[in-house]
Amino acid sequence: MSAQRSAAARVPQWLALLLVCLAGLLLEVGYTRIVSYKLWYYYTYLVIGLSLLGIGSGGIIVAMWAPIRRAATERIIALCSLWGAVSIVAGYLVIARIQIDTVAIWDYGTQASFTNLFALGIICFFVFSTFIALGIIVSTVLGRAREGVGRLYFADLLGAGIGCLLAIPLITRLGPPIVIMVAALIFAVVGLLALPRPAVEPKRSVTRDRVILGLGAVVALALAGVVVAGEDTLPNIRTENGKLNATGSEVLHSEWGPVFRVDVADAGLPNRLLVHDGTFGSGLWPFDGDTSKLSRFETDPRSIPFSVLGDPPERELIIGSAGGQEILAS
């Protein structure tokens, strides 16, 4: 069968491209939140660069590796999608649990510096590698489209756009770990649907395709179970050694948001501590409405703007109330 002639498939190429691009955007945005929580917020830009590098590397593989150029398009979509699903799961498990202290990297020449630089390299590799399959699929489909490239490229952009629209609502509702598993599930489903029908394949490949189909179905079912069951089925993300890493019974509530992961930790009754992405956020102090108990704010730096004004303003705008402390100070 010619590489340019597609075997009969269960899913049209435009739909496969739309779905994998949607999953790719969910994966990328999900990892920006995971890495921001695990490491520090500025490593978010590293995720974006590594994702683009992975997609571009997929295109280089297509250009340089002859077996891919000889393979049927649907087979490439199927195998790369299934491989992508497995690589996403494996990558997440490694990234979530690996121990690292990026601050120690700056102690140049020490064992801690080399050890943590190596750990950062592992994280970078697994983020990068999860996007290679997407790059191979996109490069193969668009590179062979000829006169139909406009329609397929539109599907590519539409899928990416839908992924952008869904990323924040899904992160808020499900959390980034499950969003990453949703991306893996989409890849797995596309892989299963893209496998060519046995009727149009040589007999020697029918058994191989059935094995691939069976393994892919197991992966898809496992991922579906994780997505339905929720984040508790996945290992906890181990944060930087320098972060608070509030876990266990001391955590009273945890919630992922579009900006921070917020944990409410027990700071000794009756106070609570807000933890933003594993770093100190602000304290939560009880207040019963009696302003006579707020004398501590008279020497608090947060009262300086009001001391400068002298007379209390009729209206004021507070940006970032820090657990209500600025409100009480006002």
Residue ranges and their predicted role:
Residues M1-S330:
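Alpha-helical transmembrane segments of multi-pass membrane proteins
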